[in-house]
Curated annotation (Swiss-Prot):
Species annotation: Streptococcus pneumoniae (strain 70585)
Reactions catalysed: adenosine(2503) in 23S rRNA + 2 reduced [2Fe-2S]-[ferredoxin] + 2 S-adenosyl-L-methionine = 2-methyladenosine(2503) in 23S rRNA + 5'-deoxyadenosine + L-methionine + 2 oxidized [2Fe-2S]-[ferredoxin] + S-adenosyl-L-homocysteine; adenosine(37) in tRNA + 2 reduced [2Fe-2S]-[ferredoxin] + 2 S-adenosyl-L-methionine = 2-methyladenosine(37) in tRNA + 5'-deoxyadenosine + L-methionine + 2 oxidized [2Fe-2S]-[ferredoxin] + S-adenosyl-L-homocysteine
Gene Ontology biological process terms, A to Z: rRNA base methylation; tRNA methylation
Binding site for S-adenosyl-L-methionine: 163-164, 195, 218-220, 296
Compartments reported by the entry: Cytoplasm
Active site residues according to the UniProt entry: 91, 340
Keyword Cytoplasm: yes
Enzyme Commission designation: 2.1.1.192
Lineage: Bacteria, Bacillati, Bacillota, Bacilli, Lactobacillales
Binding residues annotated for [4Fe-4S] cluster, in chain numbering: 111, 115, 118
Name the UniProt record assigns to this protein: Probable dual-specificity RNA methyltransferase RlmN
C-alpha cells in the first residue's frame, strides 16, 4: 500500500522533491495544493509538471481513507466512519462549538487500555494509525464543509477518539507538527488537546517536548482501588506515579492540565469521591481543571448507568466549594451512536451478521 502524502512533514517533502531533481519550492506548491486548496488528486496540481505528478502518483496517495458512514445529529454534530486501506474501521467526530469547529480524531484501530465503561476497548488494538491517516481525518472533515460551499474551517482538535494517543506517541507528535505547520492547516497548538489514560512515562516525555498542545488526563476515580477496578491502566501507573508525572509536566511547562471524570451512577459520583478528588488536586489546584462527563451507556457495559442530574450537581457543587475549577461537559450527538467507539462497534456487528446470513441464508 502506498503511503498518504499527508504523512510527509514539510521538511521531508522538501527533501523528497530535491531527490526527484526538482527545486525546493515545489514542496511549498504541493503543500499549498494539499492544505490550502485541499485538492483530492495530484492531477489537480496544475502548476506541477506531468513528470512530477506521475512521481507523486507512483509513490503516494492523497486520501488513504474511504468514507463508509456519516451520521448527522440535530445539534450539528457529525460522526464519520472511515475505512482504512487495509479494510479496518475508525471513527472521527465533528462538533460545532461556540468557539469554532472541533474535530475528535482516532489514533489507533481498537484500544488495549481496557476501561470497563468504554466502547472503544470492545475491540482490542489491531494497529497504530500513521501520521498521514490521522491528518487525513482532519482533511476529510474539512472537505465536508468545502463541498457544501460553507466558508468554515476546522479550528480545534481533540485527540480523544479510539485508542491511547501516547501508545502511538511518535505518530501523534508528527501529526501535531503537520497540522500546526504555518504552511499547512496552521491550527494553533493551543487549539489542540491530547488526552491520555495515564501513561506516566509518556507524560514526562511530552513535558520535555516543549510543544504547546494542551494535556488532558482521563482520571475517572480519586483513589487507586476504585480507579484500578474501572481502568486497568492504573495497575501499571497508580495514582501516585501518575500525579508525580503530572506535577513534573506542570513544573516543566507551567501549563495546566484538564482532568476528565466520567460520571458513573453510584460508582464514582458520590460526594465522598468529590472530596477525595479535591484532596488529590490540592497541590495543583490553580493549574487543574475538572471536566465532568455525562456517561453514554454502552450495551456491553450494562453494569454502568448515567448519574442522575442531582448527583452530578452535588459532585460539581462540592468541587466548586473547595475551589476546584470544573465544568459539566456539554453533550454532543446524543441522538446518534454518541459514545466513542459505538458506531464502529455497531457497524462491525452488522457486517458480521450479514456475512453469517450470506453463508447460512
Amino acid at each position: 500500500m502506498k503511503p498518504s502524502i499527508h504523512s510527509l512533514a514539510h521538511q521531508t517533502m522538501q527533501e523528497w522533491v530535491l531527490e526527484q531533481g526538482e527545486k525546493k519550492f515545489r514542496a511549498d506548491q504541493i503543500w499549498e495544493w494539499l492544505y490550502r486548496k485541499r485538492v483530492q488528486s495530484f492531477e489537480e496540481m496544475t502548476n506541477l509538471s506531468k513528470d512530477l505528478i506521475a512521481k507523486l502518483n507512483d509513490q503516494f496517495v492523497v486520501n488513504p481513507l474511504k468514507q463508509r458512514i456519516v451520521q448527522e445529529s440535530a445539534d450539528g454534530t457529525v460522526k464519520y466512519l472511515f475505512e482504512l486501506p487495509d479494510g479496518m474501521l475508525i471513527e472521527t467526530v465533528l462538533m460545532c462549538q461556540h468557539y469554532g469547529l472541533s474535530v475528535c480524531v482516532t489514533t489507533q484501530v481498537g484500544c488495549n487500555i481496557g476501561c470497563t465503561f468504554c466502547a472503544s476497548g470492545l475491540i482490542k488494538k489491531q494497529r497504530d494509525l500513521n501520521n498521514g491517516e490521522i491528518v487525513a481525518q482532519i482533511m476529510l472533515v474539512q472537505k465536508y464543509f468545502d463541498e457544501r460551499g460553507q466558508d468554515e474551517r476546522v479550528s480545534h482538535i481533540v485527540v480523544m477518539g479510539i485508542g491511547e494517543p501516547f501508545d502511538n506517541y511518535n505518530n501523534v507528535l508528527n501529526f501535531f507538527r503537520t497540522i500546526n505547520d504555518d504552511k499547512g492547516m496552521a491550527i494553533g497548538a493551543r487549539h489542540i488537546t491530547v488526552s491520555t489514560s495515564g501513561l506516566a512515562h509518556k507524560i514526562r516525555d511530552f513535558a520535555d517536548e516543549g510543544v504547546q498542545v494542551n494535556l488532558a488526563v482521563s482520571l475517572h476515580a480519586p483513589n487507586n482501588e476504585l480507579r484500578s477496578s474501572i481502568m486497568k491502566i492504573n495497575r501499571a501507573f497508580p495514582i501516585e506515579k501518575l500525579f508525580a508525572a503530572i506535577e513534573y509536566y506542570i513544573e516543566t511547562t507551567n501549563r495546566g492540565v484538564t482532568f476528565e471524570y466520567i460520571m458513573l451512577n453510584e460508582v464514582n459520583d458520590g460526594v465522598e469521591q468529590a472530596l477525595e478528588l479535591t484532596e488529590l488536586l490540592k497541590n495543583i489546584k490553580k493549574l487543574s481543571y475538572v471536566n465532568l462527563i455525562p456517561y453514554n451507556p454502552v450495551s456491553e457495559h450494562d453494569q454502568y448507568s448515567r448519574s442522575p442530574k442531582e448527583r452530578v450537581l452535588a459532585f460539581y457543587d462540592t468541587l466548586k466549594k473547595k475551589g476546584v475549577n470544573c465544568v459539566v461537559r456539554q453533550e454532543h450527538g446524543t441522538d446518534i451512536d454518541a459514545a466513542c467507539g459505538q458506531l464502529r462497534s455497531n457497524t462491525m456487528k452488522r457486517d458480521r451478521q450479514k456475512a453469517v446470513s450470506a453463508v447460512n441464508p
